[in-house]
Amino acid sequence: MDSDSCAAAFHPEEYSPTCKRRRTVEDFNKFCTFVLAYAGYIPYPKEELPLRSSPSPANSTAGTIDSDGWDTGFSDITPSVPDRCFSHLQPSLLQRAKPSNYLLDRKTTDKLKKKKRRKRRDSDIPVKEGFRESLLKLEAADPYVETPSSPTMQDIPQASADPCSGWDSDTPSSGSCATVSPDQVTEIKTEGKRTIVRQGKQVVFRDEDSTGNDEDIMVDSDDDSWDLVTCFCMKPFAGRPMIECNECHTWIHLSCAKIRKSNVPEVFVCQKCRDSKFDIRRSNRSRMGSRKLFLD
């Protein structure tokens, strides 16, 4: 490349098509925009400025030669060729050239969906908490306790007004139930889970068991067996439930025998009879062993 021919590029009237120049960053950017527009990634620029009028960077080595040399490289291609060849493809390319807008719309829709999900979760959380609190309250409440606010229990008279309520139908004295005034009903004491209530000449024992199967026991205090002592605990009958041993026919309190009133066995053997059987077997073994030694 001659210096004279390159120097002529500074004067447009002395421009020669044989002069070549170096490509600049601006030329590369223009080429990239053309390729992207051709591929459909970006739309075509609305106004294409003439390449010769674009100023070159101040720090470029070739100066204005760069702008003239870009036209020389594409001098054989007329500017109307892309418009003729690809004019029918421009609408489709413009439709394909909207991935960035589509992504933005998709992001906005995703954000809206996330917000809706958060609102639903926030609305579901207090409902779940209220349901759990109601369950905890129901579990904590005793199912056997009668609440005064319930409409069904308001019509039913309380147990203190009816002295016959809660008595066992199998007891002989339950048939002849006399009316007792509230003044005669006095609570004597409470022993553990048992409540002793005196109603005139009758005493009612009420056991508060967790199972709720135990019933009240009514015993006449004038009975001869009231002060009878038969159990091994050396305490009187006193109206407490008892069971008879099938071996020694001794009456023992259910509490001493560790038997629940809801689970009374048909055959019962007291602890003394069991121990005596064990002692008899052990003594027989010792006797047989001593006899064998004596015979030997």
Swiss-Prot record:
Segments carrying motif Nuclear localization signal: 106-123
Keywords: Cell cycle, Cell division, Chromatin regulator, DNA condensation, Metal-binding, Mitosis, Nucleus, Zinc, Zinc-finger
Maturation and modification: Subject to proteasomal degradation. Stable when bound to chromatin. The soluble form is rapidly degraded.
Pfam families: PHD_5
Gene Ontology cellular component list: nucleoplasm; nucleus
Subcellular location: Nucleus; Nucleus, Nucleoplasm
Top-rank taxon: Eukaryota
Primary localization: nucleus
Region feature Interaction with trimethylated histone H3 (H3K4), mapped onto this chain: 237-244
Record's signal peptide: none
Chain intervals for the UniProt region annotation (Disordered): 51-73, 97-126, 145-183
Record GO terms (molecular function): chromatin binding; chromatin-protein adaptor activity; histone H3K9me2/3 reader activity; zinc ion binding
A biological-process GO annotation: mitotic chromosome condensation
PHD-type Zn finger ranges: 230-276
InterPro entries referenced in this protein's UniProt entry, alphabetically: PHD_PHF13, Znf_FYVE_PHD, Znf_PHD, Znf_RING/FYVE/PHD
Comp. bias intervals (Polar residues): 53-64, 147-157, 168-183
Job description of the protein: Modulates chromatin structure and DNA damage response by regulating key determinants of chromatin compaction and DNA damage response. Binds H3K4me3-containing chromatin and promotes DNA condensation by recruiting corepressors such as TRIM28 and H3K9 methyltransferase SETDB1. Required for normal chromosome condensation during the early stages of mitosis. Required for normal chromosome separation during mitosis. Increases both chromatin-associated levels and activity of H3K9 methyltransferases, such as SETDB1, thus enhancing H3K9 trimethylation.
Subunit: Interacts with histone H3 that is trimethylated at 'Lys-4' (H3K4me3). Interacts with GSK3B. Interacts with TRIM28. Interacts with SETDB1; the interaction probably enhances SETDB1 chromatin-associated levels and activity.
Protein's name according to its UniProt entry: PHD finger protein 13
UniProt gene name: Phf13
